[in-house]
Amino acid sequence: MLTEEATDILINHLTDKCPDIIIHYYHSYTSNSIYIKLDYGAANSIRISDHDKSDNGYNYKYELRTDKTLSWHRFENDIYKIMYPATQIEQLANKIIKEREKKMNEKGQSYLNELNKRKNYMDSEKSKKFYKLCTELER
């Protein structure tokens, strides 16, 4: 399965089950990787690829790999990371939605405040490269 196909399937699962989720994505120019931020990053981020990542300094909670068959989880750079193979896209979508709902329920208004803060940052001149190059999914 290609990374683009895996991305389309994942996005369809996420938007079908959670229509209000905000999705930004970026397809790398230098590799076959696609990067997604959910709710401006407030609901974490995903790297979809067919290869091990280079040490680019970015950290993604979720990773979807088209070249792997087994899932794993580990702590790396103080972040609990979870990798799913492309055969488990629906499980990944369910995990993301469950964790997003948990954050929203626990944080309440502060989750929305964080989302708005991140949106304002994205729109600012100080925003990082991802936000300058990414595309927001239109529904």
Model-inferred region functions:
Residues 79-124:
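Charged, low-complexity eukaryotic segments
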Residues 50, 64, 68, 103, ...:
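Sequence-pattern detector for short linear motifs
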Residues 41-98:
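Intrinsically disordered, low-complexity regulatory segments enriched in Ser/Thr/Pro
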Residues 1-41, 107-138:
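Negatively charged, low-complexity tracts enriched in Asp/Glu with abundant Ser/Thr
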